[in-house]
A protein has these predicted regions:
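Acidic, Ser/Pro/Thr-rich low-complexity regulatory regions
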Residues: 1-108
Length: 108
């Protein structure tokens, strides 16, 4: 089992808030575009409520921080397009390899 280093854990905690903020900004932009459509107000309201309920479950919005889950969390953030693989370039090579294995099923 892969052990997350203290420096990777610290870096993850420093980065996650910014990544989530950027992702939520993209969501808000999508909501604004959607709300600007010509659909009926009731249709927009209920569709928006459905979108928000779904989006709240995305790790780009809500994530429980556990040191042991960092490789899996990074993979989930990549798979849900919250971040790109390049965004984890500051992390250790070992962690990048672990995430690469989870996301792509192979080592670098």
């Amino acid at each position: 089992m892969y052990e997350v280093s203290k420096s990777d854990w610290k870096l993850f905690r420093e980065k996650i808030g910014g990544w989530q903020e950027r992702y939520m900004e993209r969501l808000v932009e999508k909501y604004i575009k959607f709300l600007s459509s010509d659909k009926a107000a009731s249709e927009k309201f209920w569709e928006l409520e459905k979108k928000i309920r779904k989006d709240k479950k995305n790790p780009g919005v809500l994530i429980e921080l556990r040191k042991s889950d960092v490789p899996w969390d990074l993979a989930a953030l990549i798979n849900t397009k919250v971040i790109k693989f390049e965004d984890i370039g500051e992390f250790s090579e070992d962690l990048q390899d672990a995430v690469n294995l989870i996301v792509y099923g192979r080592d670098n």
